[in-house]
Amino acid sequence: MMAEQVKCASPVAASGAGPGPVVNAELEVKKLQELVRKLEKQNEQLRSRAASAAAAPHLLLLQPPPPSAPPPAGACSPLATHRAPASTTSPGPGALGPAFPGTYCLPSPAPSLLCSLQPADAPFVYSKPAAGFFGGGGSPEPGTAGTPPGEAATPPLPPPTLLDEVEPLDLESLAAWSEEDDYTWLYVGSSKTFTSPEKSPSPLQWCRHVLDNPTPEMEAARRSLRFRLEQGYTSRGSPLSPQSSIDSELSTSELEDDSISMGYKLQDLTDVQIMARLQEESLRQDYASTSASVSRNSSSVSLSSGKKGTCSDQEYDRYSLEDEEEFDHLPPPQPRLPRCSPFQRGIPHSQTFSSIRDCRRSPSTQYFPSNNFQQPQYYPPQAQTADQQPNRTNGDKLRRSMPNLARMPSTAAASSNLSSPVTVRSSQSFDSSLHGAGSGVSRVPSCIPSPGQIQHRVHSVGHFPVPIRQPLKATAYVSPTVQGSSSSGSSGSSGGSGSGMPLSNGTQLYSTTGIPTPNKAAASGILGRSALPRPSLAINGSNLPRSKIAQPVRSFLQPPKPLSSLSTLRDGNWRDGCY
């Protein structure tokens, strides 16, 4: 529409004066006045919207829509803008018409953007008049249409943006910062207000301060840590530690002892082990107080055995006799054998050693298995040869378990202890913890009697009371070659030295069950004879059919059935109590 008006006005101005052109000019002026009023309304709307939409001031930089798009009513092409100034130069009343359209057709980027916010019914896109055009295009006459165009010609202020409305904040006034507050961004407790030099102590200074002025909590932690360290250190070397001092003197290495103890822990006897250790500690204390001399003798014997049988067999016999005499006077161990029997299976040899001490204390300890075992083991000097040293170590382990057998209320318990290879190990360790484990054990393998011999001995043992100890000793520990000499020697020593082990078993059985324990004697003989599982099997055989040897031993030991039955009963009793 605007373009048509401009096109019409330009030829009229060029043609000259006439009635038709004058009427057209007046009509154009009226139309232009209406347009100005509409533009003023649009400007007001745009200003109000710009205040709200100023959040996107970058839109003002957008270019006007391309000329290819159909311009809305009132918009003129660039051609019209150029023709309008030319028309103003021509004299005549129609000069006004083209001048105003020129002013409104002048494109400006700001109105074009703001017009995009206009409602759809707004016909004009270019709503902002170019203020500078009136200077070039001539001012309108005041009489005709000066006032409305003048109002529209006043250049509107640029719409305010959000940035203009935002008040700048004075950070220094809001946050009272000072040079000393460089670290205030770090949290500082209200209770602790430091001066600037105290805020950044060096790590060394801080450590020095904390260490020089320890808190009560730190002191308590220090004391507890010291106590633990001292306890752990002393427990290693203390004779009351799980690994007794006698064990440390054994010829067997500590690694073997550890492996044996680990093997026990793998079994389901943890509770039993704990109880056994408690009993062992109490027994050791009682033993130390009541039998210091016995401990000296045992230590000397163990030392001699650690020296690989430097002492002669007679010395061993003497030690065993002395120990037995002392044992007779010792009070019985507080924990009875049935109590300890369960531990014999799964407890490390150190505990088995405590069980040996129990046997010593008990009135029947005269037949203390440890001494008896040691004596028969020591009898065969042949076993002390270097070739038999490995056997000796095994024998030591078997001997350790032997005290368990003596401790056992019945041969069944002893056999059960030795039934597993672990029990065999414990017996060996026990023997080694006893005296002369190394040399005695090596002799034992050579002295182990054949099953037939064992059977014969078992029968004899079962029928005979404690005095039969001597034949038991000779049979159990002496090899077939040495049997004659060993048996005679054992009888000479009254079973205390040579036949000490079988005798101790038999006597202890008498004390506990009142029945000779040929089973124990045979088992102990087998154990002493070899650090091999076979002796352990024989021991088990007395009451347990676990091992092949155990079964034949059973048959051999059958004559003393009352003893085996008692042992089985006791075995069941202690099992019930422990588990």
Curated annotation (Swiss-Prot):
Its main location: cytoplasm. The modification Phosphoserine is found at residue 241. Residues 233-243, 362-373, 412-432, 502-516 have a biased composition (Polar residues). Residues 21-56 form a coiled coil. Keywords: Coiled coil, Cytoplasm, Cytoskeleton, Methylation, Phosphoprotein. Residues 63-73 have a biased composition (Pro residues). Belongs to the SLAIN motif-containing family. Microtubule plus-end tracking protein that might be involved in the regulation of cytoplasmic microtubule dynamics, microtubule organization and microtubule elongation. This is SLAIN motif-containing protein 1. The lineage of its organism: Eukaryota, Metazoa, Chordata, Craniata, Vertebrata. The gene is Slain1.
